């Protein structure tokens, strides 16, 4: 089966109109949904690369997380520009960073436009590496714009052997692996120790887990927390991933969107929590949500995966941010007042994959970056020890899990041990190319229902309208009976 056409590649992100997509691919009239399988990766782009390689490495991403990992842990880094726009390597290669925020599909839209122009771009302007997320990984890896990490770039089975299998599966099509990552992203429930002690009489992670081990128990604790004037969750979106990661089938079957019953359980719970005052009516990433994680917050806990602990929650917990001279230490805000437990269901959230772009003239450098930053056990272990990120090397993580490692931010808890168990339960078999757009549209459509501005049927209709505007090739929506 052929890979995603240029037309459907664009439609998968809702990036352009049909007419613009037709122009981009010479008038193709195909409107089928992206295929779930593809032919083996083309090695033509790799064979076109000059043996000597280029002297500019263009990397595209949506925030500075990978940029920080690269600058801090890639051994070939020689110099970093003051404004961080470029990084110079030991061999003189200049890494140019292009960072476009994720909001409203902005990153994908700009990336898609650049990839469509890759063939005609000057060598030093071509994208060499770009980053993708789990929610839309299949859109890119099931296309001609990404190189096979083994056949085209040169990584070996031995290089990749230590990685979690799911991190390889999600970026593989017909046995062709098209990306690699330094992180695994199992999810846990991060709770305030002081609030847990007030509500449950204990802050011990093992004991707290017994109170939160299924949704009925979780709801009971929400009622107990409310009785003491706490919110169980901050807002509408907090529990969403825990439900959406436990669905029975992908969002899309052919050209039909099928809403899973488990997604509707999230709707029912969130409506109940909103009506009963168990949440603070915040939205993911808004100022209220961030404040609820800090010193003035009165929220029991937050569903977070690995990156969220060190990349978001820690920063939000501080009274004085690091940028303003604050230190990451007990005494600054509520640093040390969080802990984690498994929560009611296993889930994952996010994950970032490194892809080599077809047409790059820097194959050897891409290979070295991938080897060092995603396959090197010592580097993976050091990243975790330094940053608390959970890295993609099973042996290294098991070693830390079994050690006396502890997180001061989490009150001395070894959260890596819990993440190591949760990582074994990750199932990405239902991931698809439309996930980001459908998840966002669904959450947005139902917020008016949660707040009482529309009824449930209207929220459903609004979701259908939104996704058909975003993805014209999707023809029907089926709701659970």
Give the location of each predicted region:
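Conserved N-terminal structural module of periplasmic/extracytoplasmic solute-binding proteins
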Residues: 3-5, 10-138, 157, 381, ...
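Beta->alpha turn/N-cap motifs
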Residues: 62-64, 132-136, 236-238, 287, ...
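Long, aromatic- and glycine/proline-rich binding clefts that accommodate carbohydrate-like moieties
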Residues: 332-336, 384-444, 448, 476-481
């Amino acid at each position: 089966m052929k890979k995603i056409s240029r037309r459907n590649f664009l439609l998968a992100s809702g990036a352009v109109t049909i007419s613009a997509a037709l122009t981009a691919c010479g008038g193709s009239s195909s409107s089928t949904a992206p295929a779930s399988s593809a032919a083996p990766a083309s090695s033509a782009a790799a064979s076109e690369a000059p043996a000597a390689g280029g002297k500019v490495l263009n990397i595209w991403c949506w925030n500075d997380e990978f940029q920080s990992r690269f600058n801090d842990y890639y051994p070939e880094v020689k110099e970093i520009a003051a404004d961080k726009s470029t990084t110079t390597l030991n061999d003189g290669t200049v890494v140019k960073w292009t960072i476009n925020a994720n909001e409203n599909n902005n990153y994908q839209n700009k990336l898609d436009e650049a990839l469509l122009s890759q063939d005609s771009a000057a060598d030093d302007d071509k994208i060499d590496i770009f980053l993708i997320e789990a929610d839309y990984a299949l859109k890119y890896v099931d296309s001609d714009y990404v190189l096979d990490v083994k056949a085209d770039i040169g990584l070996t089975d031995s290089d990749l052997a230590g990685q979690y299998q799911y991190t390889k599966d999600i970026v593989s099509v017909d046995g062709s692996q098209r990306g690699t990552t330094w992180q695994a992203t199992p999810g846990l429930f991060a709770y305030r120790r002081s609030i847990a002690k007030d509500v449950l009489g204990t802050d011990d992670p093992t004991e707290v887990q017994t109170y939160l081990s299924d949704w009925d128990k979780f709801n009971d604790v929400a009622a107990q927390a409310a009785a003491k004037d706490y919110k169980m969750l901050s807002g509408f979106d907090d529990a969403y991933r825990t439900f959406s990661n436990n669905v029975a089938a992908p969002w899309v079957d052919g050209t039909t969107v099928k809403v899973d019953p488990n997604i509707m359980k999230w709707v029912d719970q969130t409506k109940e929590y909103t009506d009963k005052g168990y949440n603070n009516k915040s939205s993911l990433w808004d100022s209220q949500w961030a404040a609820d994680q800090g010193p003035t917050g009165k929220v029991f806990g937050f569903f977070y995966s690995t990156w969220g602990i060190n990349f978001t929650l820690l920063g939000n917990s501080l009274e004085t941010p690091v940028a303003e001279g604050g230190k990451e230490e007990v005494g600054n805000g509520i640093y040390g007042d969080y802990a984690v437990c498994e929560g009611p269901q296993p889930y994952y959230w996010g994950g970032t994959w490194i892809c080599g772009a077809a047409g790059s003239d820097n194959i050897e450098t891409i290979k070295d970056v991938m080897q060092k930053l995603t396959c090197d056990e010592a580097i993976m272990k050091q990243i975790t020890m330094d940053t608390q990120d959970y890295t993609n090397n099973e042996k290294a993580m098991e070693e830390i899990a079994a050690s006396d490692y502890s997180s001061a931010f989490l009150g001395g808890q070894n959260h890596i041990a819990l993440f190591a168990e949760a990582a074994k339960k990750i199932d990405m078999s239902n991931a698809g190319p439309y996930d980001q757009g459908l998840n966002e549209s669904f959450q947005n459509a139902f917020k008016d229902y949660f707040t009482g501005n529309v009824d449930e049927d209207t929220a459903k209709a609004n979701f259908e309208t939104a996704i058909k505007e975003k993805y014209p090739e999707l023809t029907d929506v089926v709701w659970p009976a």
